[in-house]
Curated annotation (Swiss-Prot):
It comes from the Archaea. It holds the Pfam family Ribosomal_L32e. InterPro entries: Ribosomal_eL32, Ribosomal_eL32_arc, Ribosomal_eL32_CS, Ribosomal_eL32_sf. The lineage of its organism: Archaea, Methanobacteriati, Methanobacteriota, Thermococci, Thermococcales. It comes from Thermococcus gammatolerans (strain DSM 15229 / JCM 11827 / EJ3). This is Large ribosomal subunit protein eL32.
Amino acid sequence: MDEKARLLRVRARLKRKKPKFLRQEWWRFPKFKNDPKWRRPKGIDSKMRLKKKGKPRSPSIGWSSPRAVRGLHPSGYEEVLVHNVKELEAIDPTRQAARIARTVGARKREAIIARAKELGIKVLNAR
């Protein structure tokens, strides 16, 4: 657990420095501003593809987080999406935490939270 906590701190530090990777010339076109996602530059004269100074950064393997903590919640738990009380039974409370699905209503949400408390499972989005 000690090593995992250290790697989570390393990941948080790396994420603070990591830029948002947006597609080339996203600022010029409204259709790109409203849909910010990465697309690889493929133009033959593209300065971004050639990694010129002053141009936006491109994703590369060096920006990734440590493999042991990749995809984990900042608390260190692996997230498991839960739709009902029965799905809580499959969760390992030592390394997994529940996230209640957005389609779950108030009554079932209360039941899930109550059962999770009995089982000692952390609920990430318990209001």
